[in-house]
Amino acid sequence: MGIHAKLETVQLPLLVSCLFPPLTMPAKDVQICPIAVDTTVFRSRTWDRLKFEIEYGLQRGTTANSYLISADKIALFDPPGESFTDNFVGTLIQRLDLNSLDYVILGHVNANRAHTLKLLLSLAPQATIICSNPAAQNLEKLLADAEVNNPIQVMKGNDHLDLGRGHELTFIPTPSPRYPGQLCTYDPRTEILFTDKLFGAHVCGDQVFDEGWTIYQEDRRYYFDCLLAPAAAQVSAALNKLEAYPAQTYAPSHGPLVRYGLRELTRNYQQWLSEQQAQALNVALIYASAYGNTSTLAQAIARGITKAGVAVTAINAETSNAEEIKEAIGKSAGFIFGSPTLGGHAPTPIQTALGITLANASKTQLCGVFGSFGWSGEAIDMLENKFRDAGFSFGFDTIRVKFKPTDQTLKMCEEAGTDFAQALKKAEKRRQPKSALPESESARTEQALGRLVGSLCVVTAQQGELSSAMLASWVSQATFSPPGLTVAVAKERAIESLLHKNSCFVLNILQEGNHLGLMKHFLKPFAPGGDRFADVATETAENGAPILTESLAYLECRVQQRLECGDHWVLYAVTDRGALLKDGVTAVHHRKSGDHY
């Protein structure tokens, strides 16, 4: 019998074969599948968005992958977070006598995972915890109030653990600012590399492995851009370490296991990392986080910066030394500080980083401040006042978030990051000397390119509480059957994050002679998170996006493909329905140069 014939889905208390899923998918379950000799994956699944974090923004669900090696010794990798605790532990008990569990191996440690660990370790008091030294220090704090006394064994680079039957595990520390205790593990018996946060994707489905791996390209790129791009230097160092291990399968914490597209995904990571490290401008993003909220904000701001073509050097002040902070400030065109407020103050590592920055930063560097708080937020005010008194200019209004961030908060942070990056790029352009050379071939080409004309349109989108819009003229019909069109969207546009595959939008076509008001409205700058539709007459389309009632016509569209083209995404969308609202002709945008809109 083949591996896939043994695939199971467990939703307590019933066992259901995932080969024949129910018509209505359960909100959460645990899928079990043997993946190699002595090795099984437990995929805790949800089809809903798990958290309000930018990395879950595609809203395609996720899996929290745990792995069990049952050799002479038994080891469990990466129990899931609090959202899956009951389902996972209940399912594990059905498959394993927890008194026989020898090791719990942790790729990383955070407060979310600690909830599951407390229950699991109370049921398996004999199990030894395997983790890195930073993870062990964090774990001792997180488990301080729990009645568990499991031994902790710290693993360093190239340390080994023999489970028997050829499963002699090797451990590879791969720290990053957000996950300073990250630990990858290689099993030579199965040639599986357990990669924790590397090579994952937030997507939920029945497929355990990545057959037809190209369908996951967008999910994996988005995951990389949100989670790993701000730590490009550390991720690049991690990949260099992992090259020494001849893996045939990547076993990540989230999404399908990587087997069929392993080489291509590895090459993609190397390319994406090279692109980040080659950016001309860099922002130092320095933060500390007490409960994870400030780091969530930092991740959203970083996403906004990197999508605008500026690199980010993320610095976790709690785990970085003075030289690292000084070097990051020295290489950056701007810096952003994020802090929680603890007892009315900023954490000591943030105060230390502040002193280093004030002593070494140039007043030409742009700055920004953000943070989360429970009651008063004094740390955020302190940082803002210190930088303002020192004469620094701010790239966005200070962001203050009470308790946990929401979808709207994260969108505001992303847009603030984009504004920050755009301000840096404009300043850099002003500093560049103007050429005194005669008209170049490229200038003549730009003039010719500018003679291409396009219909003036407004693209509008709505997802839950989030909405956005942009003026567009790079629009063209692409197909007759099905009726389809293409629209080019700059990577740094705020609406870009709402226009991924299967997303819906409305293309509002403007009318000649009645377009200037809408054109001026959507050309004006909006504050991060600002309402694009204030004082604009709209109706709601069947796909949920706004229709501008003053437009000539509209088309309800659904994104089918995204093609990365330089500094733009070219979207191919099918039109589900549309209507002519007025008699008239389409407004057309005429340009003189192809180097701007």
Curated annotation (Swiss-Prot):
Residues 283-421 form the Flavodoxin-like domain. One of its GO terms (molecular function) is electron transfer activity. Binds 2 iron ions per subunit. Its cofactor is Fe cation. Disulfide bonds: none annotated. PROSITE patterns: FLAVODOXIN, FLAVODOXIN_LIKE. The keyword tRNA processing does not apply. Keywords: Electron transport, Oxidoreductase, Transport. Its EC number is 1.-.-.-. Residues 59-254 are annotated as: Zinc metallo-hydrolase. It comes from the Bacteria. Residues 449-597 are annotated as: Flavodoxin-reductase-like. Mediates electron transfer from NADH to oxygen, reducing it to water. This modular protein has 3 redox cofactors, in other organisms the same activity requires 2 or 3 proteins. By homology with NorV in E.coli, may be involved in nitric oxide detoxification. In the N-terminal section; belongs to the zinc metallo-hydrolase group 3 family. This is Putative diflavin flavoprotein A 3.
